Amino acid sequence: MQEQKLQENDFSTLQTFKRLWPMIKPFKAGLIASGIALVFNALADSGLIYLLKPLLDDGFGKANHSFLKIMAFVVVGMIILRGVTNFISNYCLAWVSGKVVMTMRRRLFKHLMFMPVSFFDRNSTGKLLSRITYDSEMIASSSSGSLITIVREGAYIISLLAVMFYTSWELTLVLFVIGPIIAVLITIVSKIFRKLSKNLQDSMGELTATTEQMLKGHKVVISFGGQFVEEERFNKVSNNMRRKGMKMVTADSISDPVVQIIASLALVAVLFLATTPLIAEDNLSAGSFTVVFSSMLAMMRPLKSLTNVNSQFQRGMAACQTLFAILDLEPEKDNGTYKAEPAKGALEFKNVSFAYQGKEELALNNISFSVPAGKTVALVGRSGSGKSTIANLVTRFYDIEQGEILLDGVNIQDYRLSNLRENCAVVSQQVHLFNDTIANNIAYAAQDKYSREEIIAAAKAAYALEFIEKLPQGFDTVIGENGASLSGGQRQRLAIARALLRNSPVLILDEATSALDTESERAIQSALDELKKDRTVIVIAHRLSTIENADEILVIDHGEIRERGNHKALLEQNGAYKQLYSMQFSG
């Protein structure tokens, strides 16, 4: 059985960006508009510096007041151009970033919904939430910010070089010696930044998972006085994240001054060259020297930004790799083509053995039994004996590698997954409700399929109508996250109503009445007894009183069937079932 682990591949920046590009490509018009605006923004900046030469040589040097007045309007025009192009570039890039993040999140969300249950067993919810929220946003903020810097500062440097070369090509040659050194430096630190950024994102996932664990288990924490334990756990994880963050800052802080020092050497070289006879005799005016020197000073900022953008861009690429690691995982297998509308409900297990991923011990060992259509089989045994595993295999939450499970004589592997699960309704011990109305929770994923009358009928059959009618908006009451405003018994009744409404031929009740009081349990049991006439029912129960009328009872122990028969026959055997029964009713 293939293990579904999150494991990032160490692709190069170029390989990662190539995978990201198909998500960006549909919005390339925004990128082009932003790029053009950034280029004009850079030209306006470099143009302002170039104007220093005529201002100094012609305007102030020759006291040409008419020229100075004209130049004043030119300067204002260039500043307006800078403002307009800055707005266009920022807006267009924000639009593209938002679209890319939305596309990535939608792909992730859809992919996660089709992952097998085993994937979620092995990966914490907190880390997955961090991937969808933090990492996807990191792609937008890092990549868009990096793109702005690369295009604007790159265009600015090129335009400054053009201005310098046009003004004095001799002095400009100094930069062609310094440039390759800076390029080599940036290449070296890029791999370091990507590795450090990956570690930082992993720490963010651990932090989210730790926080989520405390929030979800808050009642347990305060009940057992575990605040100190959780605080220590959180402090350790948050300090680990802080340390990894400081490594990023250290690498960033070291690379920045190194580039600045190398660039400053170019300024020193220009000052010395300006005094040499070759340059001095070449009619180098004050305006020309000022333009070259100012251009070199102005180039310090974009060089610094381009150095910093590398770390920013690597954070985005590292986030991409973590997200692509999820998208590369194989979704739940759905190779079947058979459809039954509806199935009759005859179930059969043939020599089924099963072990959970990462565990050598078998959860089920050579299990064989059959349930004729319309009959009820009950599974009893101690916790961890394998009862719930049997229920999970019927719906293919997990796939077996040994044996067969048949529905109406057809291997469930041959069914289309959606069709198989349409024919099975599950009510488990742990009820999950959505932050929606009661009606929408009962008719979940099929609100348009059922009428309000059918929803009310299902609620009535589940003995939920009484408490629903007492709520402020009745069936239109929003119940909060996971039904937080309801009691455990009320939540369980809604889950039963959901299963009743679905009207599937196979009904799986995994401790379905465990959260109900005795009176409610009797009422629910009466409703379930009526359902057994037309459905195949698998009942998993600790309370043996709820399964006395089952057509067959299987006693499961350590993944094997120890005893089988109806209630009366098993009591007469005086075996494991009799012991369980005596333990429950001895008091």
Swiss-Prot record:
<dbReference type="GO" id="GO:0005524">
    <property type="term" value="F:ATP binding"/>
</dbReference>
<keyword id="KW-1133">Transmembrane helix</keyword>
<feature type="domain" description="ABC transmembrane type-1">
    <location>
        <begin position="32"/>
        <end position="315"/>
    </location>
</feature>
<dbReference type="GO" id="GO:0034040">
    <property type="term" value="F:ATPase-coupled lipid transmembrane transporter activity"/>
</dbReference>
<dbReference type="Pfam" id="PF00664">
    <property type="entry name" value="ABC_membrane"/>
</dbReference>
<dbReference type="InterPro" id="IPR036640">
    <property type="entry name" value="ABC1_TM_sf"/>
</dbReference>
<keyword id="KW-0445">Lipid transport</keyword>
<keyword id="KW-0813">Transport</keyword>
<keyword id="KW-1003">Cell membrane</keyword>
<feature type="transmembrane region" description="Helical">
    <location>
        <begin position="31"/>
        <end position="51"/>
    </location>
</feature>
<dbReference type="InterPro" id="IPR039421">
    <property type="entry name" value="Type_1_exporter"/>
</dbReference>
<dbReference type="InterPro" id="IPR011917">
    <property type="entry name" value="ABC_transpr_lipidA"/>
</dbReference>
<keyword id="KW-0812">Transmembrane</keyword>
<dbReference type="InterPro" id="IPR027417">
    <property type="entry name" value="P-loop_NTPase"/>
</dbReference>
<protein>
    <recommendedName>
        <fullName>ATP-dependent lipid A-core flippase</fullName>
        <ecNumber>7.5.2.6</ecNumber>
    </recommendedName>
</protein>
<feature type="binding site">
    <location>
        <begin position="381"/>
        <end position="388"/>
    </location>
    <ligand>
        <name>ATP</name>
    </ligand>
</feature>
<dbReference type="GO" id="GO:0005886">
    <property type="term" value="C:plasma membrane"/>
</dbReference>
<dbReference type="InterPro" id="IPR011527">
    <property type="entry name" value="ABC1_TM_dom"/>
</dbReference>
<dbReference type="GO" id="GO:0015421">
    <property type="term" value="F:ABC-type oligopeptide transporter activity"/>
</dbReference>
<keyword id="KW-1278">Translocase</keyword>
<dbReference type="InterPro" id="IPR017871">
    <property type="entry name" value="ABC_transporter-like_CS"/>
</dbReference>
<keyword id="KW-0067">ATP-binding</keyword>
<dbReference type="Pfam" id="PF00005">
    <property type="entry name" value="ABC_tran"/>
</dbReference>
<keyword id="KW-0547">Nucleotide-binding</keyword>
<dbReference type="InterPro" id="IPR003593">
    <property type="entry name" value="AAA+_ATPase"/>
</dbReference>
<feature type="transmembrane region" description="Helical">
    <location>
        <begin position="145"/>
        <end position="165"/>
    </location>
</feature>
<feature type="transmembrane region" description="Helical">
    <location>
        <begin position="169"/>
        <end position="189"/>
    </location>
</feature>
<dbReference type="GO" id="GO:0016887">
    <property type="term" value="F:ATP hydrolysis activity"/>
</dbReference>
<feature type="transmembrane region" description="Helical">
    <location>
        <begin position="68"/>
        <end position="88"/>
    </location>
</feature>
<comment type="subunit">
    <text>Homodimer.</text>
</comment>
<feature type="transmembrane region" description="Helical">
    <location>
        <begin position="259"/>
        <end position="279"/>
    </location>
</feature>
<feature type="domain" description="ABC transporter">
    <location>
        <begin position="347"/>
        <end position="583"/>
    </location>
</feature>
<comment type="similarity">
    <text>Belongs to the ABC transporter superfamily. Lipid exporter (TC 3.A.1.106) family.</text>
</comment>
<keyword id="KW-0472">Membrane</keyword>
<comment type="function">
    <text>Involved in lipopolysaccharide (LPS) biosynthesis. Translocates lipid A-core from the inner to the outer leaflet of the inner membrane. Transmembrane domains (TMD) form a pore in the inner membrane and the ATP-binding domain (NBD) is responsible for energy generation.</text>
</comment>
<keyword id="KW-0997">Cell inner membrane</keyword>
<dbReference type="InterPro" id="IPR003439">
    <property type="entry name" value="ABC_transporter-like_ATP-bd"/>
</dbReference>
